[in-house]
Amino acid sequence: MTKSVTVKDLKERLNLELICSETGLERPISTSDLSRPGLELTGFFSYYPEDRVQLFGMTEISFSEGMEPEERLKRYKQMCTKRTPAFVISRNLEVPKELVAAAKEADIPVLRSRLKTTRLSVYITNYLESRLAPVISMHGVLVDIYGLGVLITGSSGVGKSETALELVKRGHRLVADDNVEIRQEDEMTLIGSSPAIIEHLLEIRGLGIINVMTLFGAGAVRSSKKITIVVHLENWDPDKHYDRVGLDQEKTKIFDMDIPKITVPVRPGRNLSVIIEVAAMNFRLKNMGYNAAEQFTQDLNNLIGHNSSMND
């Protein structure tokens, strides 16, 4: 599932000035890639990425000013296709009247920004990548624990929401409960958020639906968070081997990314919120270069080696 973006959305997000063709603001934008139509101004249209936002900077405008008006109008008309979303001019540069005429005829919006071309390009690309990123929904709870986005998964009734409530009481922040919308902003980033209709809400069996922001304040929630680790809760299986040292690192795949995963068995008497809290701290410590399990194994091997040499 992908979210649609219109030229109007881009205009409002970046506070762009509309030069012409207001009725074309509902044109869809289908890609985050931008085009700098320098070669097109010379007449090269063998490859013209017509579905991209066309960005004009100082180079393109300066080059076009050296062209004859008739040729300039011809080139701009060639750029105006049914799939072209919009033309964007940077640096508050003067918009060529031929571009305005061609855009009006094709009902393509012409927008202008005061930003420099490179910075404007970055802002547009980042915004479109965020909005056009592929999205999936996962059953689980997303909590911000010590700055880490922890996605808690598990079968229905295993205690995910109750654990999240305890984590909120311990000072952490709820992002989403029950249904987590996950979008892949780039090859290394997964962002989780809540559907608008259930944002800030927790469903607790026997208690019902509670509003976390109303009960605990604005500091207890956040709208989105990068997913760093997955904690999977499952009912204790006496026949299953669970990691007791921490040397093995499980992974789970979301989109095409491998996310670190910790499986926590659930049974009466285990304080899941504390376990997950410590798991987040331990994961952060590993990223800082210290692994308690590896250090223990190394110390144990050194001790065994020392005792063996003493016995020889």
UniProtKB/Swiss-Prot annotation:
Q: Which UniProt keywords apply?
A: ATP-binding, Carbohydrate metabolism, Kinase, Magnesium, Metal-binding, Multifunctional enzyme, Nucleotide-binding, Serine/threonine-protein kinase, Transferase
Q: Which residues cross the membrane?
A: none
Q: Where is this region: Important for the catalytic mechanism of dephosphorylation?
A: 265-270
Sites binding Mg(2+) sit at S161, E203
One MF term in the entry's GO annotations = protein serine/threonine/tyrosine kinase activity
Any one annotated GO CC term: cytosol
Its Enzyme Commission number?
A: 2.7.11.-, 2.7.4.-
Pfam families to which the protein is assigned, alphabetical: Hpr_kinase_C (PF07475), Hpr_kinase_N (PF02603)
Q: Which GO terms describe its biological process?
A: regulation of carbohydrate metabolic process
Q: Which residues form the active site?
A: H139, K160, D178 (proton acceptor), R244
Region: Important for the catalytic mechanism of both phosphorylation and dephosphorylation; residue ranges are: 202-211
Highest taxon of the source? Bacteria
UniProt-annotated binding residues for ATP: G154, S155, S156, G157, V158, G159, K160, S161
Catalytic activity from the UniProt record: [HPr protein]-L-serine + ATP = [HPr protein]-O-phospho-L-serine + ADP + H(+); [HPr protein]-O-phospho-L-serine + phosphate + H(+) = [HPr protein]-L-serine + diphosphate
State the CDD domains in the record. HprK_C
Give the required cofactors.
Mg(2+)
Query: What additional remark is attached to this entry?
Result: Both phosphorylation and phosphorolysis are carried out by the same active site and suggest a common mechanism for both reactions.
The protein's job, in short, is: Catalyzes the ATP- as well as the pyrophosphate-dependent phosphorylation of a specific serine residue in HPr, a phosphocarrier protein of the phosphoenolpyruvate-dependent sugar phosphotransferase system (PTS). HprK/P also catalyzes the pyrophosphate-producing, inorganic phosphate-dependent dephosphorylation (phosphorolysis) of seryl-phosphorylated HPr (P-Ser-HPr).
Describe the family membership recorded for this protein in Swiss-Prot or TrEMBL: Belongs to the HPrK/P family.
**Entry text on domains:** The Walker A ATP-binding motif also binds Pi and PPi.
Q: How does it assemble?
A: Homohexamer.
Query: Record's NCBIfam families?
Result: hpr-ser
- Name the chain's protein: HPr kinase/phosphorylase
Organism, scientific name: Listeria monocytogenes serovar 1/2a (strain ATCC BAA-679 / EGD-e)
